[in-house]
Amino acid sequence: MAPPGRPGRWQDGRVAGVARSMGVRHSTGTGPESGLVYEIPLRTRFRGVTVRQGVVWRGAAGWAEWSPFLDYGPDEAWIWLRAAMESADIGWPDPVRATVPVNCTIPAVDPEVAYAMAVGSGCTTAKVKVAEQGQELADDLNRVEAVRHALGPTGQVRVDANGAWDVDAARAAIRQLARFDLEYVEQPCAHVDELAELRRRLARDGIGVLIAADESIRRSNDPYRVAELRAADVVVLKVQPLGGVRACLQIAERIGLPVVVSSALETSVGIRAGLALAAALPQLPYACGLNTVPLLTDDLVEASLVATGGHLTVRDLVVDPLRLSSAAAPSDVVEAWRTRLREVHHAMAEMQSGEGRIV
């Protein structure tokens, strides 16, 4: 086995044979066109998502995953593809650490379920989803309280609103949530100027809860506005949405704020790229949101990237041909992803010609 984090050291066993048996030409150093389309249900609805789909393939440097959410158009999905191509064709920078601290992720579930998930994770940090459509602030308070009890006074609890609140609603919610000694609130409002205004109001109120920016980084034409407007205390970086490990390292260096590395709800194939980023960062002051494979009902590798004692080990992965076969998407889904890939290639061609968004 190669040292932790070295690119390209994935073993695939009988994967090529499995792919051929499904009528999909297996990728051996080519690209996503010959990859395998997977479909894996989630254990619990997560921000409206009940199933994850994506494409995996093996390039010259290793395995890669391309899995932009279905509501992402070509103008965003091509950036995810660029990240996957880095994993497949180039590999990742050398790591500076062998393990990465991680949080557990608690969906918008009942308090009893939230408590059990937090205890069962073995993590000392939890990220709790709040502001779920169809729920009330009281639901959030009960869920966060349950997680706080599960982790005890020394645990870290952060919440994520995914931009669902306006400034007034965020201020009101945080005033109540602050009693649970939050580590930070992730993306309470959708827009950068709203985050900046919220931070000013919280400071005037004497509420010392930190603000983290996620969507304002990964879905922005200018991620650095977060720092320029003093809109956040922490930034969340996700490898696929931001175009790869090296692109994220550049943002981390330039933005001048503490970084948390999180997943985009991928299989272990995609999580491994996030782990490579977390392992390569010079400083890692917070637990990372990379322990999300337990939210899936299945995976694509023999030994999934699941936390032990609140940490993930930076290690090589072995793709499981039986799991690949089990997760193979039906033909209509495969065709939809082929169409999507063609649209993304067109968008990438436009980017290379100087039109559109460049990250």
Question: Positions of the model-derived regions?
Answer:
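A short pocket-lining beta-strand/turn micro-motif at the edge of beta-sheets
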Residues: G62, L257-V261, L284-Y286
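Catalytic core of soluble alpha/beta enzymes
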Residues: Q133-A276, D298-L300, L305
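Oxidoreductase and adenylate-handling cofactor-binding alpha/beta cores
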Residues: A276-Q283
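Conserved beta-strand termini and adjacent loop/short-helix elements that scaffold enzyme active sites
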Residues: I40, T105, D214, S262, ...
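Short helix/strand-capping turn motifs
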Residues: Q283-P294
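N-terminal capping/lid subdomain adjacent to the active-site entrance of alpha/beta enzymes
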Residues: G5-R179, D205, V301-V359
